[in-house]
Amino acid sequence: AACEGALLIVDAAQTAGSQPIDVQALGIDVLCFTGHKALLGPQGTGGLYVRPGLFIQPLVVGGSGVHSFDEQHPAQMPTALEAGTLNVPGLAGLCAGVEWILAQGVETLCAKETALAALFYKNIRDLPNVKIYGDPEMALHAPIISLNIGDEDSARIADILWEDYSICVRAGAHCAPLMHKALGTVEQ
């Protein structure tokens, strides 16, 4: 991207906290992530890494709470991108999640999640009516398995997996209604 004068912007919503990410080695200019997934923070948290020296013009600005009498929003990073009051309790929760992950080791957690996903896949791939989307055996694959079982409601499947097998999964649209429309899984 840099050779062509383009920025490399990475959406790490599914990987931050569960996969090692070296922004410098990968040449990432901007990395956005959610806090409530693998980083174990509360909902409503997340972050944006911006390469040092790169300035992003904010779309929305608000009071910074730091320079309350200034007529212009602060231009220095990261304050320039913080519109309004920070979610301090949420950030404290996110910080606790990140500290726990770092204490365990991202690589250790990644290996454990990958092993659990592989075990789950091995035990469901040949069951009748199981439809798996994607190829969980690919080398470069996050430990995520997208599936349906017949025409069953995904929330019911999630409940059964939790109640009968202590397997925690997420059911629903996952903010991807167009994907569900393309796959024909809107009703599930």
Residue ranges of each PLM-predicted region?
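Pyridoxal 5′-phosphate
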Residues: 1-188
